Curated annotation (Swiss-Prot):
Glycosyltransferase recorded as keyword: yes
Transit peptide: 1-41
Pro residues bias spans: 66-91
Record protein name field: Starch synthase 1, chloroplastic/amyloplastic
Major subcellular site: plastid
Gene3D superfamilies xrefs: Glycogen Phosphorylase B
HAMAP family, alphabetized: Glycogen_synth (MF_00484)
Keywords: Amyloplast, Chloroplast, Glycosyltransferase, Plastid, Starch biosynthesis, Transferase, Transit peptide
Classification via Pfam families: Glyco_transf_5, Glycos_transf_1
Binding site for ADP-alpha-D-glucose: K153
UniProt keyword annotation of Plastid present: yes
GO cellular component: a single term: chloroplast
Length: 647
């Protein structure tokens, strides 16, 4: 029999209290106190400011003891002369009395046994990783995400959630990743090794009780857990199709968040559940309901009081905003509406009677998460400004004390010029001869004149306004007057796709535009080009500049977000000699971009030793995930120093 309601694991503390007769006198009054505390919280949450989160308890403040419903009071002690009684089974009836907003139809005995075992044993199934540096403190870490490579990926979020958990597991942590099991025919093979766990739960939300099941694969020392529901089985991309975003995305990712909260309590992975002492790492709006659920539906009943949550913002532009009328569908207590409340500015409202009221998933996590991380230090500052905060800048500014930035890493198993299977020739920082050969092969593949002396500039990315394609379009006529070659790879706005095709016909010996995307081609362009151009208007982190430096390709970028953090402008007169790994220009104008490109091209032609120094400094930078994982460990430890979020 499987758990059939959210919070199935919340009875674990009560099970342990059966052995403590001293609590019997208090147990009968706990339900009344719970109702009184809910009234007090309701009054407090109603005053929650739209500009900032509720005040947190002082660090020395201790949480109230777990609430124990009267019907779970421990039985009277047995007479001394009689043998020790066996533990009575938990009652199936009356569990719903825990709280009006917490529905349980029954608890499986095997789930309860698993929770008891986890209370005394938190060892993970992590394999030996002697070659990796180990963390001083190891924890149980639960990633919650809408995508993770290689199972499902639509962008950088998938890369991060497919690599960072592996890096943390290699450092000794027990790591679980919870994500949807997307099935649309072509992706079915991605989950071929994931096995059905025989565990399922029923989630009360959106006007009904929705059953989800769990699949599991153990790979690279990580427990990959896939939440299965019919809403994840449809054609199209992960979040939408040709007609736009799916209309039920709020429902789909509400299910994911509930399931992620239950998975550590009910899934026996490697023989043990993860238990209640976890670090939840929630990624973007898809997982942002998790910290709210922990604070609203678990901690008030003694569950997950030893757990913490970290929100990772990969792109603040996507916040999961839906009409305010959908809040009751989320299954949260009414008094928690303030945590998710969102009001659109007047200019964004559709008509005069539109009040602009909405719920914002990401805001809920910003309010309730214990720590907040952006994917670069520069982006952590930008999100607190009116220009980059996407409406959440004041709230994020109020949480500066728990806001940090960590630059993403790259998978050096996939991105390594010494072993890359996509390259015709290999090279290293000690022997760069293979890079010139890769350039010649790329020129042949593209039908460009094979010339070692001409600078070859590349662009890889989406063809849209955010990536600065309009600036490239305006700069190309002037840039093509130079002795230069330019190659672009990407897809996106049909207008820019058509422009790429027409520009190629206008500059047949200088310009090539590849509409679409190909992983092998992106590797060959990264290795074969001399310069990589990234004029993004905003870039939370950016990975292409990291790939470029790893391959000895010099980046020319707009100085924003993670680009500013990772690319150091060339300085021939540094304190220790020549410094820098590329050029970061600002402000974002065509003239500034052309100046940076011409400076780079001049250095390439006239100062070969300096150019080689630029290449080697970029190749020796530590872009590994292990470096990023070490910084995440510090964030986790800071989170556990403070008390968890409570109302």
């Amino acid at each position: 029999m499987a758990a059939t309601g959210v919070g199935a694991g919340c009875l674990a503390p009560s099970v342990r209290l059966r052995a403590d007769p001293a609590t019997a006198a208090r147990a009968s009054a706990c339900v009344v106190r719970a109702r009184l505390r809910r009234v007090a919280r309701g009054r407090y949450v109603a005053e929650l400011s739209r500009e900032g989160p509720a005040a947190r308890p002082a660090q020395q403040q201790q949480l109230a003891p777990p609430l124990v419903p009267g019907f779970l009071a421990p039985p009277p002690p047995a007479p001394a002369q009689s043998p020790a009684p066996t533990q009575p089974p938990l009652p199936d009836a009356g569990v719903g009395e825990l709280a009006p907003d917490l529905l349980l139809e029954g608890i499986a005995e095997d789930s309860i046994d698993s929770i008891i075992v986890a209370a005394s044993e938190q060892d993970s199934e992590i394999m030996d990783a002697k070659d990796q540096p180990q963390a001083k403190v190891t924890r149980s870490i639960v990633f919650v995400t809408g995508e993770a490579a290689p199972y499902a990926k639509s962008g950088g979020l998938g890369d991060v959630c497919g690599s960072l958990p592996i890096a943390l597991a290699a450092r000794g942590h027990r790591v679980m990743v919870v994500m949807p099991r997307y099935l649309n025919g072509s992706s079915d093979k991605n989950y071929a090794k994931a096995l059905y766990t025989a565990k399922h739960i029923k989630i009360p939300c959106f006007g009904g009780s929705h059953e989800v099941t769990f699949f599991h694969e153990y790979r690279d020392n990580v427990d990959w857990v896939f939440v299965d529901h019919p809403s994840y089985h449809r054609p199209g991309s992960l979040y939408g199709d040709n007609f736009g975003a799916f209309g039920d995305n709020q429902f789909r990712y509400t299910l994911l968040c509930y399931a992620a909260c239950e998975a550590p309590l009910i899934l026996e992975l490697g023989g043990y559940i993860y238990g209640q002492n976890c670090m939840f790492v929630v990624n973007d709006w898809h997982a942002s309901l998790v910290p709210v659920l922990l604070a609203a539906k678990y901690r008030p009943y003694g569950v997950y009081r030893d757990s913490r949550s970290t929100l990772v913002i990969h792109n603040l532009a996507h916040q999961g905003v839906e009409p305010a009328s959908t809040y009751p569908d989320l299954g949260l207590p009414p008094e928690w509406y303030g945590a998710l409340e969102w009001v659109f500015p007047e200019w964004a409202r559709r008509h005069a009677l539109d009040k602009g009221e909405a719920v914002n998933f990401l805001k809920g996590a910003v309010v309730t998460a214990d720590r907040i991380v952006t994917v670069s230090q520069g982006y952590s500052w930008e999100v607190t400004t009116a220009e980059g905060g996407q409406g959440l800048n004041e709230l994020l500014s109020s949480r500066k004390s728990v806001l940090n930035g960590i630059v993403n890493g790259i998978d050096i198993n996939d991105w390594n010029p010494t072993t890359d299977k996509c390259l015709p020739h290999h090279y290293s920082v000690d022997d760069l001869s293979g890079k010139a050969k890769c350039k010649a092969e790329l020129q042949k593949e593209l039908g460009l004149p094979v010339r070692e002396d001409v600078p070859l500039i590349g662009f890889i990315g989406r063809l849209d306004y955010q990536k600065g394609i309009d600036l490239i379009k305006m700069a190309i006529p002037e840039l093509m007057r130079e002795d230069v070659q330019f190659v672009m790879l990407g897809s996106g706005d049909p207008i820019f796709e058509g422009w790429m095709r027409s520009t190629e016909s206008s500059y047949k010996d200088k310009f090539r535009g590849w509409v679409g995307f190909s992983v092998p081609v992106s590797h060959r362009i990264t290795a074969g080009c001399d310069i990589l151009l990234m004029p993004s208007r905003f870039e939370p982190c950016g990975l292409n500049q990291l790939y470029a430096m790893q391959y000895g390709t010099v980046p020319v970028v707009h100085g924003t977000g993670g680009l500013r953090d990772t690319v150091e402008t060339f300085n021939p007169f540094g304190a220790k000699g020549e410094e820098g790994t590329g050029w970061a220009f600002s402000p974002l104008t065509v003239d500034k971009m052309l100046w940076a490109l011409r400076t780079a091209m001049s250095t390439f032609r006239e100062h070969k030793p300096s150019w080689e120094g630029l290449m080697k400094r970029g190749m020796t930078k530590d872009h590994t995930w292990d470096h990023a994982a070490e910084q995440y460990e510090q964030i986790f430890e800071w989170a556990f120093v403070d008390q968890p979020y409570v109302m």
